[in-house]
Regions:
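A glycine-rich helix->loop->beta "capping" turn
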Residues: 53-59, 76-91, 96-97, 101-104, ...
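Rossmann-fold cofactor-recognition segment
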Residues: 51-69
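Canonical Rossmann dinucleotide-binding motif of NAD(H)/NADP(H)-dependent dehydrogenases/reductases
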Residues: 2-36
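Helix N-cap at the beta1-alpha1 junction of Rossmann-like dinucleotide-binding domains, i.e.
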Residues: 40-43
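Hydrophobic structural elements of the Rossmann-like NAD(P)H-binding subdomain
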Residues: 89, 142, 184-187, 197
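Conserved Rossmann-fold cofactor-binding substructure of NAD(P)-dependent oxidoreductases
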Residues: 66-80
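A glycine/serine/threonine-rich, flexible loop-to-helix segment
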Residues: 48-49, 158, 179, 189-215
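Catalytic loop of short-chain dehydrogenase/reductase
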Residues: 12-21, 93-179, 191-193
Length: 217
């Protein structure tokens, strides 16, 4: 993979074990110029520590995906530093921890439902809308989804609905941006021990079941 001189925005680096961190490392090794975002000051040091372990000088910038103004500020920063953008990696998802265990119907709340969809799905198209004018032709937008969007996964609950929304989002975004040769895709990764996965009750059992059933040992 040759990404030399490609400008890539990676959202969702929360720890060294996050999927976004692995993507950033692979992109760095392939020659891309990277910008990693962090949600708040608490995560800033983690992101900068990960950046310092890479080969290139990596940019970092704060962005709370629930804030339109912060997404706008991120775009302005990219315009100042790079002018244009080639790749957006959206690896962000969130739901209140108390909704990721137990009975779905009994535990669901209006606020939690809205928040899960806002951060996990709407933020992807919000980024595309804000950055549309600075995306190069043939740009790529990529997000991360999971089997829980298609099948009932114990304790995944509202995140399953949010991921289903995200996948439909991908299809409509692809149609909308396709005229400019901008590709929009989603990768459905298997269960991985990440910081986000730690919030799902019984995740280790899910991981064990997948390991038992997987044809690859």
């Amino acid at each position: 993979m040759n990404l030399k001189n490609k400008k890539a925005l990676i959202i969702g680096v929360a720890s060294k074990r996050s999927i976004a961190a692995a993507i950033a490392s692979a992109f760095d090794a392939s020659g891309a110029d990277l910008l990693l975002t962090y949600q708040n000051e608490k995560l800033k040091n983690r992101v900068e520590e990960i950046s310092n372990e890479m080969n290139s000088n990596i940019l970092s910038y704060p962005c709370d995906l629930s804030s339109d103004s912060e997404i706008s500020n991120l775009k302005k920063f990219i315009e100042e530093k790079w002018g244009k953008l080639d790749i957006i990696i959206h690896s962000a998802a969130f739901a209140p921890r108390e909704l990721l265990s137990g009975d779905y119907v009994n535990n669901i709340t209006r606020e939690g439902f809205s928040l899960a969809h806002d951060i996990s799905s709407y933020s992807f198209v919000a980024l595309a809308k804000e950055f549309s004018k600075i995306l190069n032709e043939n740009a790529t937008l990529l997000t991360l989804t999971y089997l829980g969007s298609q099948k009932v996964i114990k304790n995944y609950n509202v995140m399953g609905l949010a991921k289903a929304s995200l996948e439909t989002n991908v299809r409509y975004m692809a149609q909308s941006l396709g005229e400019r040769n901008i590709r929009v895709n989603g990768i459905s990764a298997g269960p991985i021990k990440t910081l986000a996965a730690a919030g799902i009750s019984g995740f280790n059992e899910i991981l064990k079941r997948v390991e038992e059933k997987s044809p690859l040992k």
